[in-house]
């Protein structure tokens, strides 16, 4: 709808010329557009109202190229910071970032726009660097003229590191010991200690169980399948196997799904198109669904790419075994995916890569070797981005599983470096976590300064994150010294260890635990809402656990003073002692005639567990 062009435009002239010639079809040998390049690759616009002309060139299948700037369609992701005119001119607005997508023919590309404040006297502080991560973060902050916040204090760091790395809270004694330690290496030492805890494995097995959709599904996938799959995954992380080898085992799995649980990847999902979509979203961070019915409007992928990549999954065979819960996965050696348009067979082709030789081979093994290797530029970056998002609260590409040209990384150089180091380091998962946690970027305070208070994408300060459902239930149980019981697990097992995505409680559901119905990262809900607040205030989880665990009663029976109990509650829950003001106000309630100290301190315990400081990692 609406007016596309007027009678005096070049587009009008071309259309009239074509119609006058009888509206001929293009000859069969007409060169096709195979690539699109935009210049500049990044534009920095200082102050509002500054303009920058873009140039777009198309490359054709016959080796020629031409300027297509005026024929290209431009779309800005943030027109408040950078507008793009129809003829390819950028105009800056308020400080911020934008990505301008450029689309010509069936190809999409784009450029990053940084609209920075007019501050010629800006000086970046002389900040030390913890490692290469800080180098890349600082380089970006210098460009956008943002000053990073300072480092968090030791109390904040130990709580943050415990929650992020192992999903637990530090014991009160551990907090006091850590704070009292004057060694300059104590934070790095703590990170190493936590990486060697069994809870680290449990955290990442849970996250990968979500990606791999480990859940029962009536008769198609029963609890024995789920627990064998889950335990196989746990064994891989316990051995710290290179993550690329784990993925290659999953994609190339064959044999019985009981004897080789990795094969359950092909028992949970049997539709070959859906398998391809899941594999690209999990292992490459890409959502290919759009390209099934039409060329992706916001990315480079075409329908040809979609069906060619899906053809790697076209020859998977499945048959029953003596146990009807198990399937035998094998290579049928025949069968192809056909393009929905024209019903033609698309030879298996790597995304953005070549057409490999698959004759006489298991196509999945060919795919596995490429996908989880250095030859695939998307794999290592995707894993690095996924881990980064866990520790930083958002990905360098966000959402983490929506990588596309029109959703670029906020810091491409940082993401590239993380991916390269992961690959060169043998896909050592722990080393990646170690690098992130030892950076000053991870260790910053959540307190903002004047320059970064509006920034949310450049990691100039730490983010405040609500603790995810399983971890929140676990730490409530931890500090109240109570236990939970989940299906198939012993009494006292943590919520992080739940095998089946179908197993849940009202608490876990309310706080956004993933059901594992899809591979989408959006299944884990971290946004706070009214239902959560009401359940904490009025539900039986916090209320019953405070009393059931008997923390306060036992402490008073051990002859601890109310003042000591208050300190211990704060240290156990918040990893800090109360401030002098907090302590004075709380002690005023102790010794009341009409209430026992036990009741007063239990009320305090309940209040702490309902506080934002407890529920959020900061």
Q: Can you annotate each of these PLM segments?
A:
Residues 480-489, 494-497, 501, 507-513, ...:
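Long, His/Glu/Asp-enriched segments that create or flank divalent metal/ion-associated functional microenvironments
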Residues 125-199, 204-487, 522-523, 543-601, ...:
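Primarily short, surface-exposed interaction patches in extracytoplasmic proteins
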Residues 9-139, 143:
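Extracytoplasmic soluble-region selector
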Residues 4-25, 530-538, 542-548:
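Catalytic cores of secreted or luminal carbohydrate-active enzymes
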Residues 2, 85-89, 293:
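Short beta-alpha junctions and helix-cap segments that line functional grooves
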Residues 50-54, 94-98, 323-325, 331-334, ...:
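A short, compositionally biased
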Residues 51, 69, 304, 362, ...:
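Extracytoplasmic
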